[in-house]
Each structure stands twice: as structure tokens, then as C-alpha cells.
Amino acid sequence: MNNDLTADSIIEMISSSKKKTPVIAYVKGHLSDIDMSGVQFFGTDNFGIIFADYEDLRQFLEKNGNKIHDVHIEAKARNSALPMADITKFNARVEPGAVIRDLVKIGDGAVIMMGAIINVGAVIGEKTMIDMNAVIGGRAIIGRNCHIGAGAVIAGVIEPPSATPVVIEDNVMVGANAVVLEGVKVGKGSVVAAGAVVVSDVDPYTVVAGIPAKFIKKVDEKTIEKTKIIEILRQRDH
């Protein structure tokens, strides 16, 4: 899977988009006589739920305040430039609490765990697991059959803009709380130890550790056994 978005194109989308403040409002009152055009309403004559942008809701409430007895408003974002992804389009396992922006690609059989954050333009390969609270920055490219450990950070390249995204090739294991900095390429089959800070490219089938990350050894049979991907965790019912 390739990343077709440049930093400049994402910056242009963010700067030119209409900023939105999506809200949910729970309303009580004499609702049967109210014109609901401009908002999305679900309910009865005296109680309902409204989905709208905050400015549209504000105008709606001002216009119909004499018919509404009570209202509770919950805002999902404020002046948001890009929407969240429609996760139903992914043939992957996405756990509750994962935060995935629009314009993200996620391959078949991938696993996105609770609290993981995937920013705009990122690419996640088939059967790759993004573990709890990991952060995948804008335009980062993660290959197939990888494991990005809990709390790890794969740097984004939107601000400051960079032409070269982070690339994690296939079958890479990134340990918990490791950090891979902007523009770095981690070669196929490599292992990045927990807590490492990777500031330069990593050769394929290499183990690196430390701050900054340095060569420890080539991947051997013992390393492969300790870092193997568990296929059953990537299975889906359909």
C-alpha cells in the first residue's frame, strides 16, 4: 500500500477546509411544530436527539427557544479541519477508543487496539497490529505483518513538512514506547527495542536499541522466535 498524499496537499486540505464543530443535542419541549430543516433530528413530539454543526444548532435554538424547555449539548470536536475515518470501510479489527483520521489506509486483517491514534494520510499494511496508545503520525507508512508496540510513536511529516515519510517495511517489530523520527526507514524484518529512539535508517534484519538507537546484532532464530507474529490474533469472523 502506497501513500498518495504529500505534506503540501494535506496542508492545503486543512487550511482550505470548512472548519466544523459537530455536536449532539438532546432536546425536550414542544417539538412537533418545529421546522427541523438544517439539522438531523431523531425523536418524538416532546423529546429528540439532534445531530448538527454547532453554528447551525445555535441558530436553530435561537429561532425555536420558546418551544424548547431543556437542552443538553455534547461537542465531539471544535473547529475540526478533517473528519474522522468511517471505520466500517476497513476489513480490519478496530477496537473501541482507537482514533483514526480520514484519508488513512488500513490493510486487510490489521488490528488497531484501544487508544491507538492514526493521523491523516498514514498507511497500515495487511495483518499489522497497532498496539494500545501507539501514535502513527501523518503520512507514515507501515508495512505488512508488523507490530507497533504500546505507546510507540511513529513520527508524522506534516508539520514541519517533509517530503520523506517514515517507512516501516514488512515484518518489523517496534517495541513499546519506542520512537521513530521523521524521514527514517526501518528495513524489512528488523526489531526496534522497547524505548529506543531511532534517528537514522535501520538495515533489514537488524536489531537496534538505545537512545539514539544503535546496532545490536543481526536478527537470528532466537530473535525471530521472541518476536513472531501471532496469526490467530488477526483473524476475523468474516
From Swiss-Prot:
Matching entries from Pfam families are given as: DapH_N, Hexapep, Hexapep_2
Keyword Chloroplast present in the record's keywords: the answer is: no
Q: Which reaction does it catalyse?
A: (S)-2,3,4,5-tetrahydrodipicolinate + acetyl-CoA + H2O = L-2-acetamido-6-oxoheptanedioate + CoA
Q: Name one GO molecular function term.
A: tetrahydrodipicolinate N-acetyltransferase activity
Q: Which InterPro entries match?
A: DapH, DapH_N, Hexapep, Hexapep_transf_CS, Trans_hexapeptide_repeat, Trimer_LpxA-like_sf
Q: Which keywords appear in this protein's UniProt record, sorted alphabetically?
A: Acyltransferase, Amino-acid biosynthesis, Diaminopimelate biosynthesis, Lysine biosynthesis, Repeat, Transferase
Q: Which Gene3D superfamilies match?
A: Hexapeptide repeat proteins (2.160.10.10), Malonyl-CoA ACP transacylase, ACP-binding (3.30.70.250)
GO process annotations (BP): diaminopimelate biosynthetic process; lysine biosynthetic process via diaminopimelate
Q: What class of enzyme is it?
A: transferase
Query: SUPFAM superfamilies this protein is in?
Result: Trimeric LpxA-like enzymes (SSF51161)
UniProt EC number? 2.3.1.89
Look up the domain of life of the source: Bacteria
- Could you tell me which pathway this protein works in? Amino-acid biosynthesis; L-lysine biosynthesis via DAP pathway; LL-2,6-diaminopimelate from (S)-tetrahydrodipicolinate (acetylase route): step 1/3
Q: Which family does it belong to?
A: Belongs to the transferase hexapeptide repeat family. DapH subfamily.
The record describes the protein's role as:
Catalyzes the transfer of an acetyl group from acetyl-CoA to tetrahydrodipicolinate.
> Mind telling me what this protein is named?
2,3,4,5-tetrahydropyridine-2,6-dicarboxylate N-acetyltransferase
Taxonomic source organism: Pseudothermotoga lettingae (strain ATCC BAA-301 / DSM 14385 / NBRC 107922 / TMO) (Thermotoga lettingae)
Gene from which this protein is expressed: dapH
